[in-house]
Amino acid sequence: MIITSLLDTDLYKFTMMQVVLHHFPAANVEYRFRCRTPGVDLVPYIDEIRDEVRGLCSLRFTDIELDYLRRMRFIKSDFVDFLALFHLNEKYISITPSPKGNGEIDIVIEGPWLHTILFEIPVLAIVNEVYFRNTQREPDYREGRERLREKIKLLGAKPEFADCKIADYGTRRRFSKVWHEEVALTLRDGLGPQFAGTSNVFYAMKHELTPLGTMAHEYLQACQALGPRLRDSQTYGFEMWAKEYRGDLGIALSDVYGMDAFLNDFDMYFCKLFDGARHDSGDPFEWGERMLRHYEANRCDPRTKVLVFSDALDIPKVMQLYERFRNRCKLAFGVGTNLTNDLGYVPLQIVIKMVRCNGQPVAKLSDSPGKSMCDDRAYLAYLRQVFGIAQPVDDDASQ
């Protein structure tokens, strides 16, 4: 069985789930799977994927896992008590061949947000591992280890990068569970203090690493349906987050509606309240410069704020960003696929995104148009109008 612990997921799933329990327990949502890599035939592996998901739905949190979560300063006791009773229910997920007949598969997750939020990361990890164990029956781990050593060597070679730290954000697109663990341990041993930690809660617990994460796009997307007014949905999301965490976990995600809309909403109050912001699409250098100017315009010293970069990073790009912004702000870097799925094979570009909440379409209009995903073009047009966002030339939202 690929997934053997419900902690084998990203920390931000639990931080968002706690907000859902306390503020949106009645919300119903729908997620859909998409493979952005052309020409990939997943249909032959559909039974294996279903079997693995069935195994996932048999898991419960152990007392050791619950105690670990309880010790986190921002996790509340009633949430842990809820998790003690929790398991994923197979009735909320369907996995079928796409009617297009092109090798794609349809994965639909539909049900109460509180009971479906933990599906996304392990299901993506399952699809990845099932695909690669069938297509690469003798993985070239030697090549993977050599590539990983070169990355560690590159980052650790120059003294001026001694304070440049990276984190593992690679659970969802990892080559395999075994390889992911080896990567995390190799980074810990090879980078020392330059390895900030991991988004994976299971490996953080098992190997005493720092678990990292705050919020994901789905949280702010759901607020489109849960907030009082669509135009205020991003502000509403930030306010509800602050109401739950009272200044903790203060990294705001910036690209659900694009950078312009984010800066319009992220006013002086939020600049002072939140610790920083996370970049996940668009030009990271331009984004960073705009964030620093925005902080200065709102009477905040940028050197006290954190800029988190997490969009398709590799080590050379991390180093370039560090050189640009060092000493101007605090920095954090989350590296995903380039760490956990770089053995010389083409990684799958797969996602599971929320598309509806309480029966209403929800969408992400990021700074990288190809990352947008919504099944309702009329709603997308309305959302753009509300937030004053131009129609991108290469919009692929209906694909």
UniProtKB/Swiss-Prot annotation:
Pathway recorded for this protein: Cofactor biosynthesis; NAD(+) biosynthesis; nicotinate D-ribonucleotide from nicotinate: step 1/1
Keyword annotations: Ligase, Phosphoprotein, Pyridine nucleotide biosynthesis
Catalytic activity as recorded in UniProt: nicotinate + 5-phospho-alpha-D-ribose 1-diphosphate + ATP + H2O = nicotinate beta-D-ribonucleotide + ADP + phosphate + diphosphate
Enzyme Commission no: 6.3.4.21
One example of a Gene Ontology biological process annotation: NAD biosynthetic process via the salvage pathway
Enzyme's top EC category: ligase
GO cellular component, one term: cytosol
Keyword Transcription: no
Function: Catalyzes the synthesis of beta-nicotinate D-ribonucleotide from nicotinate and 5-phospho-D-ribose 1-phosphate at the expense of ATP.
NCBIfam families: NAPRTase, PRK05321.1
Family: Belongs to the NAPRTase family.
Record PANTHER family: NICOTINATE PHOSPHORIBOSYLTRANSFERASE
UniProt protein name: Nicotinate phosphoribosyltransferase
Biological source species: Burkholderia ambifaria (strain MC40-6)
Gene behind this protein: pncB
